[in-house]
Curated annotation (Swiss-Prot):
It comes from the Bacteria. Its EC number is 3.4.14.11. PANTHER family: COCE_NOND FAMILY, PUTATIVE (AFU_ORTHOLOGUE AFUA_7G00600)-RELATED, PEPTIDASE S9 PROLYL OLIGOPEPTIDASE. InterPro entries: AB_hydrolase_fold (IPR029058), Galactose-bd-like_sf (IPR008979), Pept_S15_Xpro (IPR008252), PepX_N_dom (IPR015251), PepX_N_dom_sf (IPR036313), Xaa-Pro-like_dom (IPR000383), Xaa-Pro_dipept_C (IPR013736), Xaa-Pro_dipeptidyl-ppase/CocE (IPR050585). It is found in: Cytoplasm. Removes N-terminal dipeptides sequentially from polypeptides having unsubstituted N-termini provided that the penultimate residue is proline. It catalyses: Hydrolyzes Xaa-Pro-|- bonds to release unblocked, N-terminal dipeptides from substrates including Ala-Pro-|-p-nitroanilide and (sequentially) Tyr-Pro-|-Phe-Pro-|-Gly-Pro-|-Ile. The active site is at S349, D469, H499. This is Xaa-Pro dipeptidyl-peptidase. One of its GO terms (molecular function) is aminopeptidase activity. It comes from Streptococcus pyogenes serotype M3 (strain ATCC BAA-595 / MGAS315). GO terms for biological process: proteolysis. Pfam families: Peptidase_S15, PepX_C, PepX_N. Homodimer.
Length: 760
């Protein structure tokens, strides 16, 4: 374990003493440091009628227990404080450590003993994470140190778990959206699942916009998947044009219906544990799946601003600008009289994507988004540089396949009976519009590109993204964070994992940082919390996070690739082609072992290199035919210890998100020896070699200059490391699988790897 503490708010002595008193700690500025520490420790054992017993189970020195120490005349020292602090946080002498000083250095322990600062040290200790993954104060509240009185209690600028999660209100409303996506002449209704604590105060809301939450249709999804085996189409030379089109919602009328009290209820919904954490701290949770999902009406428009509007309507309802009904019969309306109108959206992948789309509408009431692994341009999710390009791990998927997966209305047999024919018509229109044949950018994709509206974002934004995420690739977050207005508060966490959540990792206090931010933005708490704009997980060692200023630098270093002419054959034998098509993982294994059709260039680094931004391959290329696709991957190659990309569970249920509520495991990325790590990758149709909107011909056996931008990253390589460049054609995980007999030739003498670099 290593501390990377970003959530602690430095506090004055007076404020620290006041907050400790509010929690019931009987500390006195006039007492000695030793007396105050003893009083603090005894309070921790509030379950015991006699605190001597648990105090005797701690040691103050290697040869003295804590009870004996406090009964003695010995003075409090750094050695004693450190040893007791470690034990209070759950670290066991002789098990987790033998030498406290060395262990504290390894932990990067954030508290440095000064006898005159004991009150502030105790305050800081309470806000510091235990071995279990919870802060000490959260652990104490979890055990019942504070009663669940359904009111707010704060410590160090963060809300504590004092809302009763055993008496939650669970209700359903149906919000009227200014849409008619299935063109049936009726405004679409959007089902909203609400979970909120009982409280006399207006509550802020965490909203998870999740098209998955009302169920998914995996059977329809699998039937809709596309075969990747097809020839790369030779496209006609042309220029692509698109236009920015404002989304125009339909008109709605003020509702004059009576207020209903008898709301639909529910017992369970698959919740997001970060939401659960805030539910226990006085934040309502709502789950919304949007148009075309079970319980709602309309068509699943998948990614456009009509879908975004169906979520926006819910924020409008929370602020009194839209109507919600108690049921589909629309006999009574219901108002969000429990809400304070301020909303933060949460969720990963599609969920985070909807958060970005919502933010670009500038809707009033949306105070903040926490968008994890989020898409900012749907074209860049299903296409790349004029190619059909599947997200990592999902060859054959496309946006209409995702529509089939998430159109959960068809999971309700009655809805299927009444609406499936119309749904199939609209789905066919969507399949035509996305133009899988060419892989080109068009108006359909432009209407699903949130980057063009990034200037309209006015809420605070928090993004998290894995630099090993080949599903929602790093370019998605790179482009949105660099398009954000300079006037807003923005925060980016870049981790070394893949397509994963990070709120329950041991090495970063993400959960507590979000608590401080949300208390600021949604509860109006003046806590003086300041979070860096960007926090990056160092790839060279375990559990080390650093502040960075920017994602993407303008300083570059050009690395020569050699002097040879390299030939890349596209064609595979029939058996090999079928085997790779059947299992793309077998292809990846062969590729990284140098056994696929590929060209390899190894670059031995003569100095440290901190990559920050978009690596570009500038290549001199020719194709034996009038077509060609180019794939590239950059590896950190050679045996050494590296971070894994999937977090593993360190404990099973050590994190309590309330008071015995929604427990979850503590996780972390492992640090193990392996043979390589992918730094970046990229794909291009050579007919789109200059830009996305220009389709050009490929002259047979004529040299072309190609600039292939790879996925942005921040990655630290050290002197003596090997940077491996892999150039090839068909990628069996991502691209179409064209087995035609053509070859690419690369002139390395006129090719470079252009690397954006930053100082370390």
């Amino acid at each position: 374990m290593r501390y990377n503490q970003f959530s602690y708010i430095p506090t004055s002595l007076e404020r620290a003493a006041e907050e400790l008193k509010e929690l019931g700690f009987d500390l006195d500025l006039q007492k000695t440091a030793k007396a105050n520490l003893e009083s603090f420790l005894r309070k921790l054992f509030f379950h015991y009628p006699d605190s001597d017993y648990p105090l005797s189970h701690l040691i103050a020195k290697n040869d003295m227990d804590a009870l004996s120490f406090f009964q003695s005349e010995q003075e409090l020292s750094k050695e004693v404080f450190d040893l007791l602090a470690l034990q209070v946080l759950g670290f066991i002498p002789g098990v987790d450590f033998t030498e406290a000083d060395a262990f504290l250095d390894k932990l990067a322990f954030p508290i440095h003993f000064d006898e005159t600062e004991i009150i502030k040290h105790i305050h800081h200790l309470l806000a510091t994470r235990c071995k279990s993954g919870m802060t000490l104060i959260d652990d104490l509240v979890s055990q019942g140190m504070l009663t669940m009185d359904n009111d707010y209690h704060f410590f160090n600028g963060k809300s504590l778990a004092t809302f009763d999660t055993s008496q939650l209100i669970r209700e359903v409303v149906y919000v009227e959206a200014p849409l008619d996506t299935d063109q049936d002449g009726q405004l679409d209704l959007i089902k909203v699942n609400i979970i909120r604590p009982q409280s006399q105060k207006p509550l802020p809301t965490l909203m998870t916009p999740s098209p998955y939450h009302q169920g998914i249709n995996e059977v329809a999804n699998d039937k809709k998947l596309y075969r990747m085996e097809k020839e790369l189409v030779v496209k006609k030379r042309r220029q692509i044009t698109v236009e920015d089109r404002d989304f125009i919602p339909l008109e709605t009328q003020p509702c004059k219906l009576p207020i209903g009290q008898n709301l639909e209820s529910f017992s369970y919904i698959n919740s997001y544990s970060l939401n659960d954490y805030f539910l226990a701290r006085g934040f309502a949770n709502i789950y919304v799946s949007g148009v075309g999902t079970a319980g709602s009406t309309g068509f699943m428009t998948s990614g456009d601003y009509a879908q975004i509007e169906s979520f926006k309507a819910v924020i409008d309802w929370l602020n009194g600008r839209a109507t919600a009904y108690t049921s589909h019969s629309k006999t009574h309306q219901v108002r969000a009289d429990w809400a304070n109108g301020l909303v933060c959206t949460t969720g990963k992948s599609y969920l985070g994507t909807m958060s970005t789309g919502l933010a670009t509408t500038g809707v009033d009431g949306l105070a903040m988004i926490i968008a994890e692994s989020a898409i900012s341009s749907w074209y860049n999710y299903y296409r790349e540089n004029g190619l059909v390009c599947s997200p990592g791990g999902y060859p054959g998927e496309d946006l209409d396949v995702l529509t089939e997966l998430t159109y959960s209305r068809n999971l309700l047999a009655g809805d299927y009976l009444r609406h499936n024919d119309r749904y199939q018509e609209l789905l066919n229109q969507q399949s035509q519009a996305l133009d899988r044949q060419s892989g080109d950018y068009n108006q359909f994709w432009h209407d699903r590109n949130y980057l063009k509206n990034a200037h309209q974002i006015k809420c605070d934004v928090v993004y998290t993204h894995g630099l090993q995420d080949w599903n929602v690739k790093p370019r998605q977050v790179y482009e949105i964070v660099n398009a954000l207005p300079s006037t807003i508060n923005k925060h980016l966490f870049l981790h070394q994992g893949e397509h994963v959540y990070m709120h329950n990792w041991q090495s970063i206090d993400f959960r507590e940082s979000m608590n401080a931010l949300l208390c600021q933005k949604l509860l109006g708490l003046a806590n003086d919390f300041s979070l860096p704009e960007m926090i990056w997980q160092d790839n060279t060692c375990p559990q080390n996070w650093q502040e960075r200023k920017v994602f993407g630098t303008s300083t570059i270093k050009e690395l020569d690739l050699g002097q040879e002419l390299l030939l890349i054959d596209n064609h595979y034998g029939e058996d090999e082609f079928k085997a790779y098509g059947k299992d793309f993982r077998a292809f990846k294994a062969a590729l990284f072992k140098g056994k696929a059709n590929q060209a390899l260039v190894d670059i031995l680094l003569e100095e440290d290199l901190l990559i920050n931004g978009e690596i570009v391959l500038q290549l001199k290329v020719k194709s034996s035919e009038n077509k060609g696709l180019l794939s590239a991957q950059i590896l950190d190659y050679g045996k050494k210890k590296r971070l894994g990309d999937l977090p593993i569970a360190l404990t099973q249920s050590s994190i309590d998100n309330g008071q015995n509520f929604s427990r979850e495991p503590l996780k972390e990325l492992p640090f193990r020896e392996n043979s390589y790590r992918v730094i970046s990758k990229g794909f291009m149709n050579l007919q789109n070699r200059n830009n996305l909107s220009s389709i050009e011909t490929i002259p047979n056996n004529k040299w072309m200059t190609v600039r292939l931008p790879l996925q942005p990253t921040i990655y630290h390589l050290e002197k003596g490391d090997t940077l491996r460049v892999i150039l090839y054609t068909t990628d069996f995980e991502h691209t179409v699988r064209d087995n035609s007999n053509y070859a690419l030739t690369i002139d390395l003498s006129q090719s470079q790897l252009i690397v954006p670099i930053a100082s370390n």
